[in-house]
């Protein structure tokens, strides 16, 4: 795509955010690996993001991410525009609706910050968010959860923005929600295809409509008790997860009535490595960057783990992390690796 077309569109839209070109995505993702993005946009605020989206050519690929804690960008990089919401859509406030206490959080707010804010307000139910290393937008997009609670368990409503810059407030009933799965239901009134889903896109993609914020409904609780729960959760996380090395959290979804980590460990794959990527000896569902890992190293480990577990146990693990972009050398790419191609959130 011709850069003059992009520049003209941005000038015409009158955007106020920051546009960066040819940015190494290892600087924006928690795996600290991968190729470069053709463009990265950091919006000034929600109206600015709307202006940016409206100004783009209709066929410009758009990816939205937060902290990049659930995302791998292949070594060949990614074409199009990557919108980084972390620390940008960062509104966080207490509201009340007919006696129900709500916390509004922008999509770029870190999940842990929401948990701390809720504790400060004497509200419970959001403690688990302290253990999710991503943003509100990413947690909404994948129904992130830990220790028995999932994001949509506490959602009252969400705010979204589409490629035309249109904002909507939607109730949970507009979505199909499951384990690490969120999809917008078909809008029967217009007879249109499921909003945000391109033909042949994965069924859990929200490609043309993204979360820009959410209202969480939380019960009253004692602030000290909430803080103690958060403290205990974080201690458990430190004890069980390899937080000392770059990683993207859980790589695979847990199969029904089982744990991905248990299956991987049962196959003797702890400390299995390719290049700088290794299955963590502390938690088998984590792949860590031991230093200098490429995206190809990480993706090769993912493929090898899936293949080995399938061969030895008969269980086919499903990926939880998102992989976007093109390989540095497509002819050498491990094509059997399953991946999501949508432009949804990356943590």
UniProtKB/Swiss-Prot annotation:
GO MF assignments: FAD binding; UDP-N-acetylmuramate dehydrogenase activity
Pathway membership: Cell wall biogenesis; peptidoglycan biosynthesis
Locations listed in the record: Cytoplasm
| Domain spans labelled FAD-binding PCMH-type | 33-221
Among its keywords, does the record have Heme? no
Q: Which residues form a coiled coil?
A: none
Q: Catalyses which reaction?
A: UDP-N-acetyl-alpha-D-muramate + NADP(+) = UDP-N-acetyl-3-O-(1-carboxyvinyl)-alpha-D-glucosamine + NADPH + H(+)
Listed Pfam families? FAD_binding_4, MurB_C
Which SUPFAM superfamilies does this entry report, sorted A to Z?
FAD-binding/transporter-associated domain-like, Uridine diphospho-N-Acetylenolpyruvylglucosamine reductase, MurB, C-terminal domain
**For this UniProt entry, what's an example GO CC term?**
cytosol
Catalytic activity, EC: 1.3.1.98
Give, as one word, the top-level EC class: oxidoreductase
Keywords associated with the record: Cell cycle, Cell division, Cell shape, Cell wall biogenesis/degradation, Cytoplasm, FAD, Flavoprotein, NADP, Oxidoreductase, Peptidoglycan synthesis
Reported cofactor(s): FAD
**Does Flavoprotein show up as a keyword for this record?**
yes
Q: Where is the active site?
A: 180, 250, 320
Q: Name one GO biological process term.
A: regulation of cell shape
PANTHER family, from UniProt? UDP-N-ACETYLENOLPYRUVOYLGLUCOSAMINE REDUCTASE
Task: Name the job this protein performs.
Answer: Cell wall formation.
Q: To which protein family does this belong?
A: Belongs to the MurB family.
NCBIfam families noted in UniProt: murB (TIGR00179), PRK13905.1 (NF010480)
Q: What is this protein called?
A: UDP-N-acetylenolpyruvoylglucosamine reductase
Q: Which organism is it from?
A: Nitrosospira multiformis (strain ATCC 25196 / NCIMB 11849 / C 71)
């Amino acid at each position: 795509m011709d850069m003059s077309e992009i520049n003209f569109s941005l000038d015409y839209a009158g955007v106020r955010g920051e546009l960066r070109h040819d940015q190494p995505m290892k600087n924006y993702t928690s795996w600290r690996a991968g190729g470069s993005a053709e463009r990265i946009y950091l919006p000034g605020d929600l109206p600015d993001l709307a202006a940016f989206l409206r100004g783009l050519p209709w066929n410009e690929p758009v990816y939205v991410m937060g902290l990049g804690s659930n995302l791998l960008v292949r070594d060949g990089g990614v074409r199009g525009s990557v919108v980084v919401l972390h620390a940008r859509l960062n509104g966080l406030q207490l509201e009340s609706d007919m006696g129900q206490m709500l916390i509004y959080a922008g999509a770029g707010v870190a999940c842990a910050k929401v948990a701390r804010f809720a504790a400060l307000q004497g509200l419970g139910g959001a403690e688990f968010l302290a253990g999710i290393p991503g943003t509100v937008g990413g947690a909404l997009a994948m129904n992130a959860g830990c220790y028995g609670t999932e994001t949509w368990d506490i959602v009252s409503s969400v705010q979204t923005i589409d490629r035309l810059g249109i904002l909507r407030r939607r109730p949970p009933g507009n979505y199909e929600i499951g384990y690490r799965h969120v999809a917008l239901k078909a809008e029967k009134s217009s007879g249109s295809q499921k909003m945000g889903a391109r033909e042949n896109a994965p069924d859990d993609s929200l490609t043309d409509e993204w979360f820009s914020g959410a209202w969480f409904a939380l019960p009253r609780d004692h602030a000290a008790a909430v803080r103690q729960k958060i403290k205990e959760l974080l201690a458990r996380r430190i004890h069980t997860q390899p937080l000392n090395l770059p990683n993207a959290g859980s790589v695979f979804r847990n199969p029904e009535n089982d744990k991905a980590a248990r299956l991987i460990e049962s196959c003797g794959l702890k400390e299995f490595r390719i290049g700088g990527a290794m299955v963590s000896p502390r938690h088998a569902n984590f792949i860590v960057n031991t230093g200098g890992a490429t995206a190809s190293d990480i993706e090769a480990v993912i493929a090898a783990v899936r293949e080995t577990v399938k061969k030895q146990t008969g269980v086919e693990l499903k990926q939880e992390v998102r992989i976007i972009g093109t390989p540095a050398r497509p002819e050498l790419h491990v094509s059997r690796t399953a991946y999501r191609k949508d432009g949804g959130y990356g943590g």
